[in-house]
Amino acid sequence: VHFSDAERDAIAAIWGKIHIDEIGPQSLARVLIVYPWTQRYFSKFGDMSSVAAISGNPKVAAHGKVVLGALEKGVKNLDNVKATYSNLSQLHCEKLNVDPDNFRALGDCITIVVASKFGNAFTPELQNAWHKFLSVVAAALSSRYF
């Protein structure tokens, strides 16, 4: 996948404004709430019986930070995203048995949280580049499945 200079600039601009400690927990919590079947992958996280329980769960927050923090590797390696996430793809495929459709769902939730945080500053042009980036990351994470 080729990223244009404008797309690279947009992705860097978005990433430069993201606070992992805020966006990460909100994004993972949103996935677990909107797509409740994803909770099965996080059975060790304890109580996830309600929106409040998920949103206030410190293990969800901590893992959300890890998940979002892992995106930085992709941002820094736009020319080789697939190789960047090869080990994570293998882990999620062979050990964790995560349905690869969930990577797209997570990307959608990250985008929603980012859009709600940045409001009108999250222009269609920025969204287009960000969506392309997250789609490439989701494909890379799914690569060991196919």
Swiss-Prot record:
Coiled coil segments of this chain: none
Entry GO terms, CC: blood microparticle; haptoglobin-hemoglobin complex; hemoglobin complex
One record GO biological process: hydrogen peroxide catabolic process
Keywords on record: Heme, Iron, Metal-binding, Oxygen transport, Transport
Tissue expression summary: Red blood cells.
Binding residues annotated for heme b, in chain numbering: H63, H92
MF terms (GO), sorted A to Z: haptoglobin binding; heme binding; metal ion binding; organic acid binding; oxygen binding; oxygen carrier activity; peroxidase activity
Domain Globin: from-to ranges: 2-146
One Pfam family here: Globin
InterPro entries named among the record's database cross-references: Globin, Globin-like_sf, Globin/Proto, Hemoglobin_b, Hemoglobin_oxygen_transport
Intrachain disulfide bonds: none
Family annotation (CDD domains): Hb-beta-like
Function summary: Involved in oxygen transport from gills to the various peripheral tissues.
Membership in a protein family: Belongs to the globin family.
Subunit structure: Heterotetramer of two alpha chains and two beta chains.
Further comment: This fish has two hemoglobins: cathodic and anodic. The cathodic Hb and anodic Hb display small and large Bohr effects respectively. In addition, the cathodic Hb displays a reverse Bohr effect and appreciable phosphate effects.
Protein name: Hemoglobin cathodic subunit beta
